[in-house]
Swiss-Prot record:
Species whose genome carries this gene: Arabidopsis thaliana
Subcellular localization(s) per the UniProt record: Plastid, Chloroplast thylakoid membrane
Keyword RNA-binding belongs to the record: no
Subunit structure: PSII is composed of 1 copy each of membrane proteins PsbA, PsbB, PsbC, PsbD, PsbE, PsbF, PsbH, PsbI, PsbJ, PsbK, PsbL, PsbM, PsbT, PsbX, PsbY, PsbZ, Psb30/Ycf12, at least 3 peripheral proteins of the oxygen-evolving complex and a large number of cofactors. It forms dimeric complexes. Interacts with PAM68. Interacts with HHL1.
Main location: plastid
Protein name: Photosystem II CP47 reaction center protein
The encoding gene: psbB
Length: 508
């Protein structure tokens, strides 16, 4: 059958057995990819520094998804939070990867079996003797089973009743760990950053799915609705399934890019909005101010800032800084972070504290401007030295470090001051190892950026697929060349040339 590549799926159009076979094979491919990708990531993942070289800096994509569902241990003897373990148990990273690969193999065999034994009695309509599927009944079965799975996940896995719970952290991504979560049944459950909403929404949606499934199993659709929505046509199923998938893809693209309890920053990296709004910078200054209020020195207050919090406040971890088509992990861009140099405080010769204006997300280059507490420009690194009034040399800017590796060190040499002013544009200053991975110094995006781009792109593609297949199933007779105004009954698809009224018609 000489089908063009874009028509090959017609071979399973009226063949339920082989339609099932290709779907099982698709599941085998998806599960096989997931397991294989997990093993590859585990082979290249370095768990030694969860603070400065976490999974998202290393470009891990499937490990964060396993971790947020409660997997934290490896058969290699390490824990994702940096500790060592002696008994990781079956459900380790490798155990989950292996389970997916075994499941993939079983699905592969099942797909072959169903391809060979396609003509099963279960697919045969006893009234006509032809292959057919009771699509409304199948819809009810699937809705019921997915409802059971959804309810079970929310009521048992997430709550820890029978399962590990999920990854939960504080708003600044410092204390994350896997723990049971109680359902949030109040209005707080609608806050996307409240983990309890994950449990309550799965329980509620699962209950609704179970009830809806039972409804569709026990109640037949009205004839006019059945015909109007073409419920007997498998392409209707394809169209509505694509709609469900593209809607879900748009939703998760949003929760990933804007952040939510389902996408913790410890696993996927910070969001761009946290840089734009100075989210971590404000928390750092709040902690320093609290320390000063307790009569700590500036050095002592900055020394108590967690390195993890300081690292989030660095533009290289902003997922919007990496180009969409720059391949590789963040570590391949600006390098592997080795240590925090400390917080630079700039002062002019009058002793006034100056603040470097930070680079906005969508700039590659940005002028070095130092302002005082009132936002008035006091110093800069001029483009044209002949016209400069506020140069570091003229204003006499010095820099002193608090916290980090350079704690207590100060510089007055203009070249060194300008070097650190340029680096302060990018947030907190870190020592970065670019030699190990031959990093090129060009920022990369995090898995948060890749996931969002991929799902938004496929959602758009699938949206058009939904429109395409929905139109095909609703207007199938028109596309086949059958005029609805014809008096004579016409055998469906009997026109040799679509829409050609001169072709011989065959009465039914």
């Amino acid at each position: 059958m000489g089908l063009p590549w874009y028509r090959v799926h017609t071979v399973v159009l009226n063949d339920p057995g082989r339609l099932l076979a290709v779907h099982i094979m698709h599941t085998a491919l998806v599960a096989g990819w997931a397991g294989s990708m997990a093993l590859y990531e585990l082979a290249v993942f370095d768990p030694s520094d969860p603070v400065l070289d976490p999974m998202w800096r290393q470009g891990m994509f499937v490990i964060p998804f396993m971790t947020r569902l409660g997997i934290t241990n490896s058969w290699g003897g390490w824990n994702i939070t940096g500790g060592t373990i002696t008994n990781p148990g079956l459900w380790s990273y490798e155990g989950v990867a292996g389970a997916h690969i075994v499941f993939s193999g079983l699905c592969f065999l099942a797909a072959i079996w169903h391809w060979v034994y396609w003509d099963l009695e279960i697919f045969c309509d006893e009234r006509t003797g032809k292959p057919s599927l009771d699509l409304p009944k199948i819809f009810g079965i699937h809705l019921f089973l997915s409802g059971v799975a959804c309810f079970g996940f929310g009521a048992f896995h997430v709550t820890g009743l029978y399962g590990p719970g999920i990854w939960v952290s504080d708003p600044y991504g410092l204390t994350g760990k896997v723990q049971p979560v109680n359902p949030a049944w109040g209005v707080e459950g609608f806050d996307p950053f409240v983990p309890g909403g994950i449990a309550s929404h799965h329980i509620a949606a699962g209950t609704l799915g179970i009830l809806a499934g039972l409804f569709h199993l026990s109640v037949r659709p009205p004839q006019r609705l059945y015909k109007g929505l073409r419920m007997g046509n498998i392409e209707t199923v394809l169209s509505s399934s694509i709609a469900a998938v593209f809607f879900a893809a748009f939703v998760v693209a949003g929760t990933m890019w804007y952040g939510s309890a389902t996408t913790p920053i410890e696993l996927f990296g910070p969001t761009r909005y946290q840089w734009d709004q100075g989210y971590f910078q404000q928390e750092i200054y709040r902690r320093v101010s609290a320390g000063l209020a307790e009569n700590q020195s500036l050095s002592e207050a900055w020394a108590k800032i967690p390195e993890k919090l300081a690292f989030y406040d660095y533009i290289g971890n902003n997922p919007a800084k990496g180009g969409l088509f720059r391949a590789g992990s963040m570590d391949n861009g600006d390098g592997i972070a080795v240590g925090w140099l400390g917080h630079p405080v700039f002062r002019n010769k009058e002793g006034r504290e100056l603040f470097v204006r930070r680079m906005p997300t969508f700039f590659e280059t940005f002028p070095v401007v130092l302002v005082d507490g009132d936002g008035i420009v006091r110093a800069d690194v001029p483009f044209r030295r002949a016209e400069s009034k506020y140069s570091v040399e003229q204003v006499g800017v010095t820099v002193e470090f608090y916290g980090g590796e350079l704690n207590g060190v100060s510089y007055s040499d203009p070249a060194t001051v300008k070097k650190y002013a340029r680096r302060a544009q990018l947030g907190e200053i870190f020592e970065l190892d670019r030699a190990t991975l031959k990093s090129d110094g060009v920022f990369r995006s995090s898995p948060r950026g890749w996931f969002t781009f991929g799902h938004a792109s496929f959602a758009l593609l699938f949206f058009f697929g939904h429109i395409w297949h929905g139109a095909r199933t609703l207007f199938r007779d028109v596309f086949a060349g059958i005029d609805p105004d014809l008096d004579a009954q016409v055998e469906f698809g009997a026109f040799q040339k679509l829409g050609d009224p001169t072709t011989k018609r065959q009465a039914v």
